[in-house]
Amino acid sequence: MRPVYIDGCYGVLHDAGGRRGVVICGSLGDEALNAYRAQVFLGESLARAGFPALRISYYGTGDSAGEDDEPDRFRAWIDSIVAAVHWLRSTCGVTSVVLCGIRIGAALAARAASELEGVDELVLIAPVTSGRRFLREQILTARTVAEIWQSTGDIDDGRWFEAYGLRLDHPTRDALDKLDIGKLYLPVRRILMLEQPDSVGNDRLVSRLRDQGIDVVHEIAADSDRLLRDSHESEVPHASFERVAAWLGDAGELVQSDRDLGAGSLELDAIRETPVSLGPADTLAGVLTMPTGHEVESPVVLIPSTGANPRFGNARGTVALARWLAEQGIASLRMDGHGIGDSLPATGEHGVPYSKQGDRDVSAGVDFLAARFRGPVIVLGMCSGAYHAFQAALDDHRIDGLILLNLQKFVWHGGESLSVVQRTTFRTTGFYLRNAANPAVWRRLCRGQVNIGGIAGALASRAVRHVAAVADPAIAAVRGETCVGMVRRQLDELARRSVEMLYLLSGNDPGLDEISEYFGMRGWLLRRNPKVIFRTLTGADHTLSAHWARQRLQQMIAAYLRQRFDVASRVEPVVADRVGRRASRPRVLSVIVPQRSGAAQESVARTVIDSAPTAA
């Protein structure tokens, strides 16, 4: 896998020698996270079959340039696909290109194909054939998440459409709403459509496409729905991918694959981002974000994976945070753990949150930063990333600061399953107390829609653990160190080492009960620790997917850096809308960057790609 930048868009080339190439077009929003790892496998499987395959992150998504508030984002997505096709032809020497779209990426690929010459084949995997249907699905997801987390914020406030990490201005939303494969004229020769088992039939669409003279193979792919599960449960639909390779057939006559891939770094408003490889045998992938307009401040920040999500994070929050830190003069590394995102697996398995490997991955990230920077190292983690940051800090004395966001577990017991833990995790005690007098809750209870037995058991268990936490010194005197005592001792050890901690929990996050069980009601013992800044963020969901929540997080981090590391804020933490930034597309610089081929690495000098300014 080789990282590249194409007109400001981050891409990964799975190189091969065939004359027929494939551009893989992913989905948007939360679906882009969940299906990311599967797309890596798709690219690898196509390359093994001889097809050079290019995964592209659209402009304003993933690790690409661009922001939510820029105009013409829909047009930018289509331009990203068009640029990827031209790049694959010019760089890899392919004579024909297949567009392979996943979910709403299928409709975007079809739209791009309607404008391109020489794209005569389309592969549509679990396709959402219209933007309107996709937006409706996102609204349902957003409402479900808001109900679960009791989070606040409008899905549509008259200016912005925001649904669990997908944030669109109205012109972009309207353009996406009008997208419909059935209304496009497609100058392609043939199409493979692999639908989900429970999808609404697209027989009418298939008939329309065949009326255009297109050879359409329309099949139900039994395993394609695995793409839509949460990233830690998402599975690679191997049968579907094998079907794609079989349908494509021969990759064509082999050509030379020792090509110069071009760009290695991305420059954005005095910020430079460079894909890097690190860890044992360079098996871990990351992006180093550096300020270029002034000297690098200390400290530096490491941002490990959250769950099995790729490094750009839910709502692209990690990218925004890294670039904001660079505006403060602070370098950062966001990285994928083993078996997550673009990183290779450590044991041949998919990335497993809360495994010991995650602790080692954090230390590998610290190795990388410590070898390049002299300042203090801060590790910023969310959920399982916070757990691994905490665990790594206990053993790695090079870690000087921790930013722990919605930490769910201080202790992970061997044999526990994340899926089981999530299914058996109930809401905070405070949530149930606040809703005890809510008539709607009682109506749901009478209809049997509330798991009253499970809730009662969870509350009773919490009460017992709260009492045990208060009585921990007496229990420890008789039975030896308890789990509560161990965690308290660990926090004390970090404090004695002067590890500065910012501990943030969303207002209804189950982590509130976790902290109460170890440090008393709402963590009162933790609040007394002089090395800990403890904050809650009312109205935010678990992943801080809302734009306002991410802005508030920036404010809290700015205060933490100012108070604990004497870092002066160079810009306002809540960044004003910067409409029109796309008027000048980013320049991609020539640098030496790692190139991955299996586990082997080599450094290659890459040529300059200088994008011309584009009108907004």
Predicted features along the sequence, with ranges:
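Short, surface-exposed "cap/lid" segments of acyl-processing enzymes
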Residues: A16-S57, T292-R334
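N-terminal cap/lid segment of alpha/beta-hydrolase-fold proteins
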Residues: M1-G17, D250-V296, A546
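The alpha/beta-hydrolase serine catalytic core
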Residues: P3-I6, D72, L116-F241, A245, ...
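Gly/Ala-rich beta-loop-alpha elbow adjacent to hydrolase catalytic centers
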Residues: C100-A109, L380-A389
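Short beta-to-alpha linker loops that shape the active-site pocket of alpha/beta-hydrolase fold enzymes
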Residues: L28, P52, S57-G62, V128, ...
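Catalytic active-site module of serine/aspartate enzymes centered on a nucleophile-bearing elbow/loop
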Residues: H232-D269, A540-T543, H547-R596, Q601-A616
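Glycine-rich "HGGG/HGxG" loop immediately N-terminal to the catalytic nucleophile
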Residues: S57-D72, M335-V352
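Alpha/beta-hydrolase active-site loop
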Residues: E70-S90, H350-A371
